[in-house]
Amino acid sequence: MFKERIRIGEYVTRIEDKDMPPKFTMDGSLSPIKNPDGSITYFATDLGARPYCRMFKGTETSPFDSFVGEYFWNYNCYPEGYPNGLWAQTVYRCDDGMLIGIVHRENFSYTDKTSLINYHIGLGVSEDGGRHWFYAGDICGNCCNYVPRVHANMGGCPTIVKDGYFYSYFNEFAPGMKKCISAVRFSVEETVSALKNKKLPRVYKYSGDGKWDTKGIGGTGAPIITKSPYSDNPYNLSIDSHSKATYCKPLDCYLMTMQTGSHGDLVLYFSKDAEHWDEYMIIDSAEKDENGMSKFMLPYSCFVDASGEGRADSFEVGGAFWLHTVHKKISEYPYDEYYVKKITVE
């Protein structure tokens, strides 16, 4: 229905690992905000830095032209200091310029193997263009948090806006480490009002059958994606939400990428209602071996509008947009190749 109208262009940007910013290791999707002069500020997560949070300025196809500086967090009593961290994985710009960050939070130790490894999604707010942020708190967790030596990473919080609600998608883990893709939903109006007062909105996970009444903290969300190129078992899809989402105006539907680990593909999903994501296509791939596996995974993609019809934060794109992808060596995590290609809608 939708994928027949998608046209995938050739790469227009290829940045080899040696040409990436010095000591830079991609550890999250870039979040773009277009400035009045046409330049774009990109919020980045850099595992090679302490702290992780960086801002770059560039163009639609060249995100690392200049280093702006760090952006800083008020952790609001949440654990801070390496290896704990906050990542503004998706940044939404309000009409008054206030920025809302959909945040990936980690609290664990790389050195103590008996430590609890905890992942959450939370909300942050900035009122100075993104240089300083306040972390209002966690809105979503999973039941495998607080279990020793369990690595239940919730992903990169790809987020859309539909009918006055944020929908943020994540890796859910049911008891027994059964992984699926689920979502949380929360009101845009309530979120803006709450964050202005450094508080949190009400948040509910997807419960299945069109219902949203499962607690964000303490409940287990139902699968919201049930198919992939590799499986029809929603708990064995081989997809991961370190990715991005947007609304495409000419298609009148929502788009969301999913990375696939050693399959080496980037899958583009389509949805009309933000709840059913049955249609998909492979939109980028790394070179594979004779067994169909790749030395590269493709996490940390993002959308940047190329039509002039989308939002400055790329929560909406027009009939042409740029797809940014990272080809990251699975056996050598700091190794990144950065690619940009143009996608058009017919």
Feature map (PLM): residue ranges:
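Acidic/His-rich structured neighborhood in mature extracellular/periplasmic domains
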Residues: 149-153
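Conserved beta-strand position repeated once per blade in WD40 beta-propeller domains
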Residues: 29-32, 88-90, 156-158, 242-244, ...
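Beta-rich carbohydrate-recognition and catalytic domains
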Residues: 1-84, 92-148, 162-238, 247-294, ...
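C-terminal structured interaction module
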Residues: 299-305, 311
